[in-house]
Amino acid sequence: MKRVKRVLALLAAFALVLAMAVPAFADGAEATYTLTINNANGTYEAYQIFSGDLSEKEAGKKVLSNIQWGSGVDATKMGSESAATVAESLTTSALAENFAEDLVSNSKLSSVKATATAKNGTAVFTGLSAGYYLVKNSSIDSGKTYTDFILEVVGNTTANHKGDVPDVEKKVEEKNDSTGATATWGATADYDVGDEINFELMGTLPESYGRYTTYKYKFDDTMTNMTYRNGSVKVYYVKDGSTNRVEISSGFASAWVDGNKKLTVTFDDLKTAVPGLAHGDKIVVTYTATLDANAVVGGNGNPNKVKLEYSNNPNDEGTGETPEKTVVVFTYKTIINKVTKGTDGNNVPLAGAEFTLSKFIASESGSDTVTVNGTEYHGTWNRGVTVTPTNTGNIANVFTFSGLDAGIYRLTETKTPEGYNTIDPVYFEIVATNDGTKVTNMEGKAVNGSEISFTENATNGSLSADVINNAGTTLPSTGGMGTTVFYVVGGGLMAVAVVLLVTKKRMENKR
């Protein structure tokens, strides 16, 4: 009997009892108690597994003796062992959990003693007599897991819902190819249209993972305005506390659907696919996608989401889903207005130009240099892009370069309007910030000694600037000073010749 008492004390510890009090009651009346579940969700059922005689051997310490099967157990299914013998065998938390699962999965429970539904995260049972109870969910809220556990009730008792859910994260790689800065991983990034972008999904196994004999684990990932790069999916596991990734080559299925916009990676049974995993271990999925030409510019960007489907009932085949996690990829645009000075001194549209916008790509072996904020970077300018201008009124002078990453750029006038001087190349940097969901600030900075002023618009992710062409110096035309001088000099020579001719004739006549 002493061993039974020790076991029951151990079960009390398993139950995470946080508070206990015995209310006053009239002589001869059976005492009843409340059981409060914190972090609760859904509806719970309480089954009395063990009953007995409640006594207080020491001040403040209450125990059950004369252990019997409670009203919540079908004693005919419990074999020949007595309740006291079974209770005495439950010497560890693992054995207690296995016992609870055996009762549930093998239909050994009978009458429900009480039910309670969670409200604002708390479920309260009332009118419970002394004993040991198995508490389990009969229903759960969306995104939660079922639980079942055994705990002692010998007074008003408080416990925590012990079911937990796996966690999932999604990250996108951010890199500045104009400066060559070390790439980082986070919730946002900005890229050029056509760039390849690396993504990472990471799911962490829950505390309850060890209670399952099979475990479904499915990543459900949805991209926006991107196209998957064929063959780029890789799957790994990482042990808790380690950074070493071990590639998983079998036991799962990956598929792209909805025009390569949605990725699923499914483990029908993670326990079989990767034996030996435990609470805190991680499953990691990586893949690469390309930013499409129809990507949203500025604003709310291009969100990409992931959720995790997982087994949520160790005694059944049900599944739950985590809330979605989102990362956002941004891209921007630069608008160049070709203008000249009008007679009133104001800028007026000017047609006939052509521009090429090139991006600086950092490289230690690059032969080009650019200076930004006093720092010189080595690299090369890419081939750049040329766009067809749109009109201001009926004048084609607006050049929109869309789908740009943050970085360093060079604007070159590759065709100059007739009668105007070609501008020097203009160097500038695109700088943008966001709050995780939308662009909050845009800035265009002149670099490398250039002069240019931008108007920023974070809502549409644009930087706009006027580029001015000045008329060239006109060469002298017929009737100009050069010709006049020529005429004057020529006329003078003719006059001299006439004078000489007349003088010569007079001299001849005198002879």
Where are these regions (language model features)?
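Solvent-exposed loop/turn and edge beta-strand elements of beta-rich ligand-binding domains
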Residues: 2-511
